[in-house]
Amino acid sequence: MRKALSPEKLQGVYGHIAKRYDFQHALITASADQKGRRILVEHSVSEGDEVLDCGSGTGTTGIMAAKKVGPSGKVTLFDLSEDMLSIAREKVVQENVQERVTFQTGDMVHLPFGDNSFDVVLSTYSLCPLYDPVKGAAELYRVTKAGGRLGVGHSTEPQNVIVKYLADRVEDIAWHFPWLSMGCRSINVLPALENLGGKVLLSKHIGVPLWPFLIFVIEKPRTEQSHQLGR
């Protein structure tokens, strides 16, 4: 796994690309990013849920969730970049879900929420740039309620050896241009979440061959079985 960009560098990168992020990410991923968001929301969110979209960026996933939770639900959009959340605020108003959405900035590795706070926690493509994605994933699990669901989408390595070699070479070039790579790299956090006690309900690879995503949904057991990673 490549060394992550610093949080300060990430803030600068995402501040720089905020206005074109949706277009750029969809173009690079051939719109597989949207497919992943839809699948995760479909398999995680129910009417009336209280949802955290962590690393929400411009709010695309959170808005999908806000539409599904209905008037009785709530969605918190949480992101490191105020510039990205500024775009999210505009989109939330355009989609007329502002009454059920709140916004907060902060670091995903140190979430300012108590244990078991949300019925559903979502993270779409936001763990990949973190300096400690395993700890970030553990934080997502911590704030998910017992019996709740955690839905994650992140970059993963191609399963074909030749394709992986080609992807690594392309990534070598992209990594020299943070505005292009967006600090994203392949990670692997599902084993750590299973180790905490999470039950896998869905696990699926999607996306283009060079830049595949792993999307998964886990359920946090109602009776705590977790081994509290790093705590």
Identify what each model region corresponds to.
Residues 120-132:
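A short SAM/SAH-binding and catalytic strip from SAM-dependent methyltransferases
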Residues 195-231:
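Core SAM-dependent methyltransferase catalytic element
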Residues 134-146:
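A short glycine-rich, Lys/Arg-flanked "PGG" loop and its adjoining helix->strand segment in the class I
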Residues 52-110:
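Class I SAM-dependent methyltransferase SAM/SAH-binding core
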Residues 1-20:
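N-terminal, positively charged/glycine-rich alpha-helical extensions of SAM-dependent methyltransferases
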Residues 30-47:
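Conserved alpha-helix/loop element of class I SAM-dependent methyltransferases that forms part
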Residues 109-120:
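A short acidic, Gly/Pro-enriched loop at the edge of an enzyme's catalytic core
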Residues 8, 24, 153-207:
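C-terminal alpha-helical "lid/dimerization" subdomain adjacent to the S-adenosyl-L-methionine
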